[in-house]
Curated annotation (Swiss-Prot):
The gene coding this protein: RNA14
Organism of provenance: Mycosarcoma maydis
Location relative to the cell: Nucleus; Cytoplasm
Stretches for region Disordered: 1-24, 36-171, 568-590, 801-868
Keyword field contains Membrane: no
Pfam family, one: Suf
Keyword Repeat among UniProt keywords: yes
Record protein name field: mRNA 3'-end-processing protein RNA14
Gene Ontology process terms (BP): mRNA 3'-end processing; RNA 3'-end processing
A GO term, aspect molecular function: mRNA binding
UniProt KW keywords: Cytoplasm, mRNA processing, Nucleus, Repeat
Start and stop residues of the HAT repeats: 172-204, 206-238, 240-271, 289-324, 335-368, 416-448, 458-490, 602-635, 672-704, 706-740
A GO cellular component entry from the record: nucleus
Length: 945
């Protein structure tokens, strides 16, 4: 080691008085290692070395030596000469303690660093290395194999989103990084990246107690992750903790269908139960006992993992173990022959990747015993073998595209409200939906019994094993758990189905699908004792999300206020420093303060507007749980317990009007009490009278009871409290009633009031509303050229089409409730502000001087928007022969953004006319140098043809 480096080392040892100071020294040395400026190097050296000369940065070679003593990379040391290699074995006692320093360096890297520090020419070469190579690897980086690197983007719960969790930086101390990851886990226990970093940090310190504690916490969230179980087993086995290893096997083997994990178990079993060589004696009880233990272990493994296509090596090892069995005597030879034939016949019936090799071995084995009996046995098993070999090709087509991430992640459509816009990323949404659909198609294929198995027990074991594999990688997808429970119900294993739903609720604590399904299953099997706790737990989860989102909003508003106060204080300080502190603020300064106040209010309004859809959506989610809770109790226990739940719900600060309506309708239809129902609506009107959607529902209820006097009184009472643009749904609902059941005087009065409220609305629109009934409309499509919103020859066909598009079919491009509301709101705005025209019509009704024509919306409800047919989408993303692969992902994302065709009710254009318009448009397509006739619709237009 050079003299300069030795002096730096001695000075550093003197400065090691606390762990915090050690971390600061490490951070400074890291800065020096990546090549900061000479001034920064001098400051860092002054902090780390109190005895260094003032000109420590003048000597570049000395700096390189000092840096290499701590941070030189192992790859750069390969360029050192033979002298450096000879010094690599120098004792490490003269190096400073690594505790609190760069803790991810291995012993080999430390040895290479020591060797490199003794070779000055090599250090000069190392100084020219790229910064990314010279910087030590941070603790948080996981060393993944190729398959893990392919799926590593799926580890983070918000991977690929704009709302990434906070990441550590290289200047953080070890304790700071640990606190950061612990905080991330506290916020989101399913943050796999944070878990892996914490475990890696504990292992780097060789703290077995901390590592065990972290693994125990980790496996409560990720109980089926084979890679982490294997890492845990390797760690315990490296310390010869055999009791701990066996305890881990008891925890994970039965619930983790991983071939690698079971191979590890068999390897461990053979290690602790070594099969002694044969002594040649007639009987060797110890060896016979060991052999029985090993064969029992293989039978145990094959019972759980033998259906996996990658378990072929376990089958071949088991066959080899039986072949090596010593058998003396006729009955023992016969037993060995029967056992071997039985294992062969089981193996060739499973679609294994090495099934052809096993079949050839079986063929040779049978022919080696007796060629006459071989034909009989081979002919019996040949159909099963041919079926398995054929199914193997289909199995590969279904299973090869399946995504198997390093750790399961939470899908974007089930993330919490705190995720913000991350759950609205269409590209990520589509990608994860395709991955889930691929697994679901594979599971459906397994349920279809492609092997034509006659043994029901074997078929059921194979399907349930497939579902277990699916939950290994899609643990946080409620759909998989639900489908597994439905399959178990279909084969009359109801109790096991309930267990799957319970496990699914633990994995997906906020899943409405699983909680509702569990309550439904409990009701079906007359076991409802724990269903109330299921509803209460789901309510607590949703309410906690609402409170957290509201707290985040208040924190954001407080931060904005603090920033504004800080700006004001800085302005006051500036004026005081300029000598204007006692002088009145001039007009220009007051104007700046006024504008700053306006900007502050705008910023607050933006934050509130951004949070409102999330909070309102969560409140509606809470309302749905309350409603389903009431319905469940009414069916199982009667109306009184349901009323008790309603009493609890209306006292909640997060209750919405839907809960009141559900209770009122329940009283009306189940208790046959219209008076109580009306009182519930009136109670809700006091709180939600400003909600036009609730008013419309109340009107519907009164009209359905034929209580026209109260309905008219309600309409007159509330219509004046709404602005015209907000009152549109109420006007439309009352107009629909008057058009159908009112007299001519009432209709004329209503038309006059509508004309006063909406003076720009065309008369033709109101006439269409008066002349139509539900979805029967002839004036619009036949006389005015307005295409019908719903296609179909009859009302029945239109109803079927509406149910197909707006129903609850599965599909990756089904719109969320929030997006539906956004589309509805935009449509409502279009009713009052958009332009409405038919082909050939002028921009005003009746010619010049008339009011502008508005966009027309039908009274009948449009179906839910869907960009594609759901069934077709599910098929194209899941099957082995993908029919949509020709479309780039960006095109699919754009197509997904397009609204449904049924939402369009304006004028229809011919595609040929649009293409001709595009062809003749003067659109610049090139840069300035190439701009000309070809770029403005000249010769360049030929490329459209």
């Amino acid at each position: 080691m050079s003299a300069e480096a030795s002096e730096a080392h001695e000075a550093q040892v003197k400065m090691e008085v606390s762990a915090d100071q050690e971390s600061e020294i490490a951070a400074v040395q890291q800065i020096a290692s990546v090549g900061v400026s000479a001034d920064a190097d001098a400051d860092a050296d002054a902090d780390a070395d109190a005895d260094a000369d003032a000109d420590a940065d003048a000597d570049a070679d000395a700096d390189a030596d000092a840096d290499a003593d701590l941070d030189a990379d192992a790859d750069a040391d390969a360029d050192a000469d033979a002298d450096a290699d000879a010094e690599a074995d120098v004792d490490h006692d003269d190096k400073p303690d690594a505790e609190g320093d760069v803790e991810v360096q291995t012993d080999s890297i430390a040895a290479d660093v020591k060797a490199a520090s003794e070779n000055e020419p090599a250090q000069s070469a190392n100084a020219k290395m790229d910064e990314s190579q010279a910087t030590p690897q941070p603790m948080a980086e996981s060393k993944l194999d190729d398959h893990q690197q392919q799926d590593s983007q799926l580890v983070s719960p918000q991977a690929g989103s704009s709302n990434q969790p906070p990441q550590p930086h290289k200047y953080m101390t070890v304790e700071q990084r640990k606190q950061l990851f612990e905080e991330r886990i506290r916020i989101d226990p399913r943050d796999g990246e944070a878990w892996l970093n914490l475990i890696e940090e504990a292992q780097s310190r060789e703290d077995m107690a901390a590592t065990r504690a972290l693994y125990d916490r980790f496996f409560k969230v990720f109980p089926n992750q084979a890679r982490q179980w294997l890492a845990y087993l390797d760690l315990e086995l490296a310390h010869s903790n055999f009791a701990q290893v066996e305890a881990i096997f008891n925890q994970c083997l039965r619930t983790t269908p991983s071939v690698d994990l079971w191979k590890f178990y068999l390897s461990y079993t053979r290690r602790v139960n070594p099969l002694a060589p044969s002594t040649g004696a007639e009987e060797d009880p110890a060896r016979e006992q060991t052999r029985r233990v090993l064969e029992g272990a293989y039978e145990f493994a094959l019972r759980f993992i033998g259906n996996d296509k990658d378990s072929g090596s376990i089958w071949t090892d088991y066959i080899l173990l039986i072949k090596e069995r010593e058998a003396r005597g006729g009955w023992k030879e016969g037993q060995k022959m029967d056992d071997l034939r039985r294992v062969y016949q089981r193996a060739v019936s499973v679609p294994l990747t090495n099934i052809e090799t096993i079949w050839k071995d079986y063929d040779a084995y049978e022919n080696g015993l007796n060629k006459l009996t071989a034909k009989k046995f081979l002919a019996e098993r040949s159909p099963a073998y041919m079926t398995a070999r054929r199914v193997l090709r289909d199995l590969k087509a279904y299973s090869d595209p399946l995504v198997k991430p390093l750790l399961p992640r939470v899908p974007v459509w089930t993330t919490s409200a705190l995720a913000g816009d991350a759950a609205q990323d269409p590209a990520q949404w589509q990608r994860e939906r395709q991955q889930a659909d691929a697994w679901i198609e594979y599971l459906k294929w397994e349920e279809s019994n492609p092997l034509l198995l006659e043994d029901v027990a074997i078929l059921q074991a194979r399907v349930t094993s497939a579902y277990r594999r699916a939950t290994m990688y899609l643990r946080f997808y409620p759909e998989v758990w639900y489908l597994a429970s439905r399959y178990l119900v279909s084969i009359l294993r109801v109790d096991e189905a309930a267990t799957w739903l319970k496990n699914g609720m633990e994995a997906c604590p906020g899943s409405f699908l699983l909680h509702f399904a569990y309550a439904e299953l409990g009701e079906a099997r007359k076991s409802t004792s724990d269903c109330a706790a299921v509803f209460d737990g789901l309510l607590d989860h949703v309410h906690a999300q609402i409170d957290a989102r509201q707290a985040k909003l208040q924190q954001d508003l407080k931060t904005v206020d603090l920033e504004a106060d800080r700006t004001k204080a800085q302005a006051a300080t500036r004026r005081a420093n300029e000598g204007d502190g006692d002088v009145d603020v001039d007009g220009e300064e007051r104007e700046r303060e006024r504008k700053a106040g306006e900007l502050l209010q705008i910023r607050k309004q933006e934050l509130q507007a951004a949070a409102k859809p999330e909070i309102e959506g969560l409140k509606e989610a809470s309302a749905l749980v309350w409603i389903k809770y009431m319905h469940f109790l009414r069916r199982t226990e009667g109306i009184r317990p349901a009323r008790s739940v309603f009493s609890r719900a209306r006292k909640s600060p997060h209750c919405t009007w839907q809960v009141f309506e559900a209770s009122a309708l329940m009283e009306y239809h189940c208790s046959k009490d219209a008076v109580v129902a009306t009182k519930v609506f009136e109670l809700a009107l006091k709180t939600f009278g400003s909600d036009e959607a609730f008013v419309v529902r109340y009107l519907d209820f009164l009209i359905s009871m034929n209580d026209d006097s109260n309905a008219r009184a309600l309409f007159e009472r509330v219509i004046g409290t709404f602005a015209p643009e907000r009152a549109r749904p109420i006007w439309e609902r009352w107009a629909k009633y008057e058009y159908n059941f009112g007299d001519s005087v009432a209709i004329q009065k209503l038309e006059s009031r509508l004309a006063e409220t909406y003076p720009d609305e065309p008369a033709t629109k109101r006439f269409i509303a008066r002349s139509s009934y539900m979805d029967l409309d002839l004036v619009g499509p036949r006389d005015l050229g307005i295409r019908a919103a719903m296609a179909g020859a009859s009302a029945a066909d239109r109803a079927v089409e509406a149910a197909k598009d707006g129903g609850a079919e599965e599909g990756p491009r089904r719109k969320t409730m929030q997006e539906m509301k956004r589309l509805a709101a935009e449509s409502a705005q279009d009713d009052t502000s958009g332009d409405w025209a038919r082909p050939g019509a002028s921009s005003s009704a009746g010619g010049a001087g008339g009011p502008p024509v508005k966009k027309f919306k039908r009274d009948s409800a449009s179906p839910a928007p869907a960009a594609f047919n759901n069934q077709a989408v599910g098929q194209q993303v899941a099957g082995p022969r993908d029919a949509w692969n020709e479309f780039p992902e960006s095109v699919l994302v754009f197509m997904e953004m397009l609204p449904s065709a049924q939402l369009f009710d304006g004028p229809m254009f011919k595609p040929e006319d649009i293409i001709d318009c595009i062809r003749s448009a003067n659109v610049p397509v090139g840069g300035g140098a190439r701009r000309g006739a070809a770029g403005y619709g000249g010769a360049g237009r030929g490329r459209y043809r």
